Amino acid sequence: MLTIGCHLSISDGYEAMGKTALSIGVNTFAFFTRNPRGGSVRQLDLDDVAALRSLMAEHSFGPLVAHAPYTYNPCSAKERAREFALEAMGEDLRRMEALPGNYYNFHPGAHVGQGVERGIELIADTLCQVMFEGQRTCVLLETMAGKGTEVGSRFEELAAIIDAVCARRPELDECLGVCLDTCHVSDAGYDIVHDLDGVLDEFDRVVGASRLRAVHINDSKNPCGAHKDRHEVIGAGCLGSAELGGGEDVFARIVSHPHLRDLPFILETPNELAGYAREIELLRGLQTD
């Protein structure tokens, strides 16, 4: 069965997220580690976390995909912003140890005029500091749309970050991966509508297929190469709409592709719970053997 879910609110706690997930028939989900705009985080309730872990085991959940707030910019030109990212990411990863075996996804950041190479250097340096030997959480760099000075819209940039971390901290190799966002990769110029195989072959050649650990499955309001990053409901955008994109076959190929089909899929579309349930039913019906 397709491992699929959506973003859920952590406001009522961990077990509540699990129960909400079950109510809409999903077997994974994503959540922000703290307010998506950043800030403080409430004390971890270990009993609540244990209740979620029990629920996940009982109902055969796949890995969860925790998401770092958007405010983190580990390659900012401002030292204070980099320090904030360093402190908060470190705290997030320590807290994630209460939920072992799951994923921590983050946006690599924007170099804001320093240049891509400097951005890569700063991101790798942050990861080398916040990650630790023996950690039980895999850190995922998200593929980006290339808006402004974002780092990570090209596969080569993601590979360079991972290579830089592993060169300094080889013991972290197994704890680094990539989350492929279907809206972002299309907006970045990778034509997954007409050449999904070619795009994934390129990823395999540049980064390595084994680094793919999760998928943010979203339609896009904009055509390939727009560098906009505006998500759309599945089937209503430039990927899955018959009028604007390639129709449902595009998402059928995505959820059925041998490099992707067994990964956790997370919806980040502009929807509510009932809408997510409909999208999930659609995508499960599109997966073929």
Segments from the language model and where they lie:
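N-terminal pre-domain/capping segments
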Residues: 1-68, 72, 76-93, 289
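Acidic/histidine-rich catalytic cores of soluble enzymes
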Residues: 128-234
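Active-site beta-loop-alpha junctions enriched in small/polar residues
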Residues: 7-11, 34-36, 69-71, 109-111, ...
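A short, acidic, amphipathic alpha-helical segment used as a generic capping/interface helix at domain edges
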Residues: 197-206, 237-259
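Acidic (Asp/Glu)-rich catalytic clusters
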Residues: 19-25, 45-65, 90-100, 128-135, ...
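Active-site acidic/histidine proton-transfer and metal-coordination neighborhood
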Residues: 58, 74-177
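Conserved, mostly hydrophobic/aromatic
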Residues: 21, 67, 96, 104, ...
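C-terminal helical cap(s) of enzyme catalytic domains, especially alpha/beta-barrels
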Residues: 273-289
